[in-house]
Amino acid sequence: MILYLSGTGNTRWVAESIARMTEDERVVDVASLCSPPLHVQLNPGEPLGISFPVHGWRPPMLLSRVLSEMTLSVGSERNVKPYVYSVCTVGDTVGESMDILRSDLKKQGVSLDVVFDVRMPNTYVGLPFMDVDKEKVVSDKLHEAQPRMEFIAEKIRERANGAFMRYLGRWKRINSRLLGEAFVRKLVTDRCFHVEESLCVLCGKCVASCPVGNMSLDDDGMPQWNHDGSCLTCFACYHNCPRHAIRFGSVTDKKGQYVFDPKRA
């Protein structure tokens, strides 16, 4: 089984690709599990994979919450240790994301055997100095991801242990603990989102793209956010808008958009 969380499609593609390469038939979207606690029932010998996008040098808040409440059993046994691996997708650097994930799992007595990272196109546009990648960089990252996933799948089949991380960055603790905690506290919110009504064509694509169902249409067909604390700030709504009508304050006014396209991979 592979549990994954994805906003614009990068991580879903990675999870599904690795599942195919390792002949794993169960790929589950964590965002569809709206009522924690989650109980994972594995077959004997079945590994558990966890795939997620790095948000602010950390695992997304929803994933941390689900995993820290998860229970796990193998077959009819509750004390059999399964092989557990994690693959994160990242546009730039990972920081201590895997250390945080390991801590979340440890709360439920689950140990992480091996970790990997895959570099994918940037999607975060919520700060002035952050934007999507240029087309050449997008193409290069997608081209590099394929052999990287093949390597990861081989290691999973071998039941390898360790850390096969390439994009930790220079200031791991500062990024994940200091900046990352500030990121979660201040920037993981839907309150900065709004709609430029003059541009909106009422297509509803933003609502359909939200992985956690945090959006709806009002009586006039205009998108609105629920403000219920569920927003991941993954920017799926922003990136999927065909008219660039979704805005995050004023910081995204001149930013680009990106959604994973399997035809480019």
Q: Could you tell me what each predicted segment is?
A:
Residues V195, V201, K205-N226, A236-D253:
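Iron-sulfur cluster-binding cysteine motifs and their immediate structural context
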Residues T252, R264-A265:
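Positively charged, low-complexity nucleic-acid-binding target-recognition regions
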Residues C34-V40:
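Feature detects long, helix-prone N-terminal segments enriched in hydrophobes
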Residues M1-I2, T8-W13, S17-L33, P44-F52, ...:
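FMN-binding flavodoxin-like domain, especially the glycine-rich phosphate-binding loop
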Residues Y258-K263:
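Active-site-proximal loop/hinge segments that shape catalytic or ion-binding/gating pockets
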Residues F164, L187-S198, V207-A208:
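Reductase modules of NAD(P)H-dependent flavoproteins
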Residues C200, C231:
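Short Cys/His-rich zinc-binding micro-motifs
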